[in-house]
Amino acid sequence: MIIGIGSDLIDIRRVAKVIERHGDRFLNRVFTEIERAKAERRATNEKMVVSTYAKRFAAKEACAKALGTGIRQGVWWRDMGVVNLQAGQPSMMLTGGALKRLQLLTPPGLEVRIDVSLTDDWPLAQAFVIISAAAAGKL
């Protein structure tokens, strides 16, 4: 069963301007340590760094929409983090208010799966998030 679907489209140049203006203050407020490390591994190409941050920002927006809250009601930026599963595909790791909200939405006895799709084509980045639940072992 689908619990929530969210999508977001963002102009990468907008993220670049915010990073230029606010720097580490913005990065530390919005992104998890894992997300910052992923972006900084691409430090040889500034466009790739900014694109990496923009896709993750879009994923957070999409996830907040899938949770039905937006960035409010106790759900904050760093409560949602893009992580890569062992095979490489992106997913979301939720903590804090985002995890509490997900637990409220999940029917008892069901297991949650969060599917994430990220893409960019300069100057745009896009993310889709689908939160689903099924009986254990059925996802």
Swiss-Prot record:
GO cellular component: cytoplasm
Matches recorded under Pfam families: ACPS (PF01648)
Coiled-coil positions: none
Gene3D superfamilies linked to this entry: 4'-phosphopantetheinyl transferase domain
Main location per the UniProt record: cytoplasm
Keywords: Cytoplasm, Fatty acid biosynthesis, Fatty acid metabolism, Lipid biosynthesis, Lipid metabolism, Magnesium, Metal-binding, Transferase
Catalytic reaction annotation: apo-[ACP] + CoA = holo-[ACP] + adenosine 3',5'-bisphosphate + H(+)
InterPro entries: 4-PPantetheinyl_Trfase_dom, 4-PPantetheinyl_Trfase_dom_sf, ACPS, Ppantetheine-prot_Trfase_dom
Subcellular location: Cytoplasm
UniProt binding sites for Mg(2+): D8, E61
GO biological process: fatty acid biosynthetic process
Catalytic EC class: transferase
Cofactor(s) this protein cannot do without: Mg(2+)
EC number(s) per entry: 2.7.8.7
One Gene Ontology molecular-function label: holo-[acyl-carrier-protein] synthase activity
Family: Belongs to the P-Pant transferase superfamily. AcpS family.
Function: Transfers the 4'-phosphopantetheine moiety from coenzyme A to a Ser of acyl-carrier-protein.
This protein's name: Holo-[acyl-carrier-protein] synthase
